[in-house]
From Swiss-Prot:
First-listed, main subcellular location of the protein, grouped into a coarse class: secreted
Family listed: Belongs to the glycosyl hydrolase 18 family. IDGF subfamily.
SUPFAM superfamilies named in the record: (Trans)glycosidases, Chitinase insertion domain
Recorded name of the encoding gene: Idgf1
Organism expressing this protein natively: Glossina morsitans morsitans
Name the UniProt record assigns to this protein: Chitinase-like protein Idgf1
One GO process term, biological-process aspect: carbohydrate metabolic process
Alphabetical UniProt keywords: Developmental protein, Disulfide bond, Glycoprotein, Secreted, Signal
Single GO MF annotation: chitin binding
Length: 444
């Protein structure tokens, strides 16, 4: 009897320890994993081999392959890298044989569209008419079927909001006064027409895809104004789910002169922050306009945004941080100015004793969000010559878990993790591979 009780207690303990990392197949919440195929070609430790992707596939319910292009001369879907995609498409979709729970989609658009953000291309496509759009749809079905994708993800690069501008107190008063007479700045004067055209296009696309036994999803990219382009109540039913990229509200490129939380859960109503620069606002907008919460997935980034500090930025560096100097230097892995992958951030935080480290090698100080509302940041003040200063806004694995709890509280359908290649897929920081992915899965 004692032996039997011991065995039962061991089983219970084992189940409890494993509960934090439930495989995707055992959980009805979605975990959408974005895979940037270009990471397959990155040099050194940045190269994401198929073996790493297999580790992630256990935890993901859906995998989104990024990215395909829109050829606006032929009105067809096309490859951004034919030499890679001609074999890599099927290499990735073949993962379904080993992971039968996994559904794999091809995404069109994203932020990799031939290296520049060409919103005009998508506007021209919406204006092109049904015949040319049908040409695109036929080409998409052919490409998806030929390579065994389960569906298409629309990540159209539509025009974005103008970035928040830095104003003095007098400047803010003048802006409010001026707005009385001029109104808001108009990014797209034909937004109402484009909204109608997008609604008609996705309706036609969804009907055709259903007949072809293909799924359709949508990704709302950062700073794309949903009010302008998405008739929420009319379009949501055309999609299996909708991913809201509720991060990068501020970036060093869009906001070079000030640093702030890039993906807060809630609004910190001070320092003249904009009311829509937070997750809660974005989710509420879609739900309040008719989209069921279970159709939505919350986008969580596995990277941080990094600003270069000046001497005038001060030494406390509490956000909002003024007098910043745009993007910080790129990391060795990500190689993008103003962006640091989680292992790159973790390596800067790992130095517990700063003695002997100076300049760019000096440690950064992490400031943890004890309120669990806004996010973490880390910084190193600049010297008197405006050198070596850095300020980073990021979600570590713990805060990604906090955001996942928000998803559960709000009855949201799941999480869209962007991007697997910026998580610590080699386990360089703590020895655990994909710590952010694992944290999200453990909290779903």
């Amino acid at each position: 009897m004692t032996s039997l009780l011991f065995v039962i207690l061991n089983i219970i303990l084992t189940l409890h320890l494993c509960a934090g990392q439930t495989p995707a197949a055992d959980n009805n919440k979605r975990l959408i994993c974005y895979y940037d195929a270009q990471s397959y070609l990155r040099p050194g430790f940045a190269e994401m081999k198929l073996s790493f992707l297999k580790t992630a596939a256990e935890f993901c319910t859906h995998l989104i392959y990024g990215y395909a292009d829109l050829n606006d001369d032929l009105y067809e879907i096309s490859s951004l890298n034919v030499d890679l995609d001609m074999f890599h498409y099927k290499e990735i979709t073949s993962l379904k044989a080993e992971f039968p729970h996994l559904r794999i989609y091809l995404s069109i658009g994203g932020d990799h569209d031939n290296g520049h953000y060409d919103a005009g291309k998508y506007m021209r496509f919406l204006e092109s008419g049904k015949d040319r759009q049908n040409t695109f749809i036929e080409s998409a079905i052919h490409l998806l079927k030929m390579n065994d994708f389960d569906g298409l993800d629309l990540a159209f690069k539509l025009p974005t909001n103008k970035p928040r501008k830095v104003h003095s107190e007098f400047g803010l008063l003048w802006k409010k006064f001026k707005k009385l007479f001029t109104g808001d700045f108009i990014v797209d004067p034909d937004a109402a027409l484009h909204k109608q055209q997008y609604t008609e296009f996705v309706g036609n696309l969804a009907r055709t895809f259903r007949n072809a036994n293909l799924s359709l999803t949508m990704t709302v990219l950062p700073n794309v104004n949903s009010t302008w382009y998405f008739d929420v109540s009319e379009i949501y039913n055309n999609f299996e789910y909708i991913n809201l990229f509720s991060f990068d509200f501020l970036t060093p490129l869009r906001n070079p002169e000030e640093a702030d939380y890039t993906a807060p859960i809630y609004l910190r109503d001070e320092e003249n922050r904009l009311a829509h620069y937070n997750i809660d606002y974005q989710m509420n907008y879609w739900v309040n306009h008719g989209c069921p919460a279970h159709k939505l997935n919350l986008g969580i980034a596995t990277y941080g945004r990094a600003w270069k500090l000046s001497a005038k930025s001060g030494i406390s560096c509490k956000p909002v941080v003024r007098e910043t100097l745009g993007p910080a230097e790129p990391g060795l892995q990500s190689n993008i100015s103003g962006l640091l992958s989680w292992p790159e951030i973790c390596s800067k935080l790992a130095i517990t004793n700063g003695a002997g480290y100076k300049g760019a090698d000096a440690p950064v100080r992490k400031v943890q969000d004890l309120e669990r509302l806004y996010g973490n940041y880390a910084f190193r003040p600049a010297d008197d010559n405006d050198e070596h200063g850095i300020w980073i806004s990021f979600d570590d694995p713990d805060f990604a878990g906090i955001k996942t709890n928000f998803v559960k509280t709000k009855f949201i359908g799941g999480v869209a993790l962007y991007d697997l290649s910026y998580d610590d897929f080699r386990g360089l920081c703590t020895g655990v591979k994909f710590p952010i992915l694992r944290s999200v899965r453990g909290h779903l």
